[in-house]
Amino acid sequence: MLRFLVFASLVLCGHSTEDVPETDARVVGGAEARRNSWPSQISLQYQYGGSWHHTCGGTLIRSNWVMTAAHCVDSPMTYRVVVGEHNLSQNDGTEQYVNVQKIVSHPYWNKNNVVAGYDIALLRLAKSVTLNNYVQLGVLPREGTILANNSPCYITGWGRTRTNGELAQTLQQAYLPSVSYSICSSSSYWGSSVKNTMVCAGGDGVRSGCQGDSGGPLHCMVNGQYAVHGVTSFVSSMGCNVARKPTVFTRVSAYISWMNNVIASN
């Protein structure tokens, strides 16, 4: 719901409805992930009407810090993070619930211009979580790392399983190979909407991110190890799984120094 406001403002800025990014990105065309197979994945939830509601994903990068998308925390709400989560509708016995104490969005983030980039935020938790088999820190890439075209990647999240569908209750995953910047920024793909501080993945018209996946990780295999190379940012307003409109992510390796500075100063 919150990201549709961003989408509406982009339309007013003159973008064609064929190419307007919709920043409310769930896993379409995926399958249920094996329980706790992605232990750095978190559920970001907001409080409303006395209940907590899933709104975005995120990645645990320190025991008391989470990386997510800036558009996920634009609204002044009370947020909490759930780690060790798999099924949102039941208690798995592995969850830990921690309130968000501080939100630090990138200073250049503009909610009215998502295609400018900088869609990244860090959340400081009220206390450190306990690391175990179900809760682990995400591995981040080296600063400046650029994925090769067609690198093996997975998107994970509790987002919608189809355009305008329902949120998933169990964590989903979908194989989304990366798409190089040169291809993704071509006129037959996203054109100038995609910047070199972003990562594209998918675009086969079958599998994609969708509403509810925003802020969550893109896990990519490089040198035999999965690392979180992307933060789910936007999809096409024509639908989540549109051919030649790959899911677009904030490129994590472009913000390593910024994140280190935020954590060190907070």
UniProtKB/Swiss-Prot annotation:
GO terms for biological process: digestive system development; elastin catabolic process; exocrine pancreas development; inflammatory response; multicellular organism growth; negative regulation of transcription by RNA polymerase II; pancreas morphogenesis; positive regulation of angiogenesis. One of its GO terms (cellular component) is extracellular region. Residues 1-16 form the signal peptide. It catalyses: Hydrolysis of proteins, including elastin. Preferential cleavage: Ala-|-Xaa. It is found in: Secreted. InterPro entries: Peptidase_S1_Elastase_sf, Peptidase_S1_PA, Peptidase_S1_PA_chymotrypsin, Peptidase_S1A, Trypsin_dom, TRYPSIN_HIS, TRYPSIN_SER. The active site is at 71 (charge relay system), 119 (charge relay system), 214 (charge relay system). One of its GO terms (molecular function) is serine-type endopeptidase activity. Binds 1 Ca(2+) ion per subunit. Gene3D superfamilies: Trypsin-like serine proteases. It holds the Pfam family Trypsin. Glycans are attached at residue 87. Keywords: Calcium, Disulfide bond, Glycoprotein, Hydrolase, Metal-binding, Protease, Secreted, Serine protease, Signal, Zymogen. Ca(2+) binds at residues 85, 87, 90, 95. PROSITE patterns: TRYPSIN_DOM, TRYPSIN_HIS, TRYPSIN_SER. Residues 17-26 form a propeptide. Its cofactor is Ca(2+). Transmembrane segments: none annotated. The keyword Secreted applies. Disulfide bonds join 56-72, 153-220, 184-200, 210-240. Its EC number is 3.4.21.36. The keyword Hydrolase applies. Belongs to the peptidase S1 family. Elastase subfamily. Serine proteases that hydrolyze many proteins in addition to elastin. PANTHER family: CHYMOTRYPSIN-LIKE ELASTASE FAMILY MEMBER, CHYMOTRYPSIN-LIKE ELASTASE FAMILY MEMBER 1. This is Chymotrypsin-like elastase family member 1.
